[in-house]
Amino acid sequence: VRIVKGANLSMENVQSEVHDWPLATYTNKLDVDANYYRLLDFILREEYADSVRIGVATHNLYTAAMAYELGKKRGVLHMMDSEMLQGMSPAQQAAVRKVFDGRQILYTPVVHADDFDVAVSYLVRRLEETAAPQNFLPALFAPKTADHDPIKEQEKVFRWAVDNRWDVHNGPNRTQNRNDEQGRQVAADSAA
């Protein structure tokens, strides 16, 4: 099971607006991060170690370190892998792979040549997500100034999310009853 966050927020925002639905996802990154840490805290346990393998999908070094330390403390390192997008921050990939004792999966889109646009849109989403100023990788390479330290800001966000992981909303933000839906697809299915 890959634990991942943030992949399609733009698409979720569009669907929410177009259909006048509540946003299905969390509305801010702090809550997303806190929920991610809650999931790791919940699943990285001995009682699940024989049943599931966890992919800790992140380029955030704080997150990778937290997952590793939690797995080490609980004796479940064998149930987890680091997962990162191939080609994105190779030096950080190598450092995390070393800490995870080589247990790392690098993923990349693979598509038929006729579907190349799908791979491009995937990579654009990843670049958009990874380059967002509130995310870890831009902070890693951003210059430190006298009044602003991007890595210290990331540490502050990380600590808040860990401290609040059990306090953020847990459950759906939107429900959907497909029996109540209207539209072209529903009409086509009913006619069949």
Question: Can you name each region flagged by the protein language model?
Answer:
Residues 188:
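Tryptophan-rich aromatic "cage" segments
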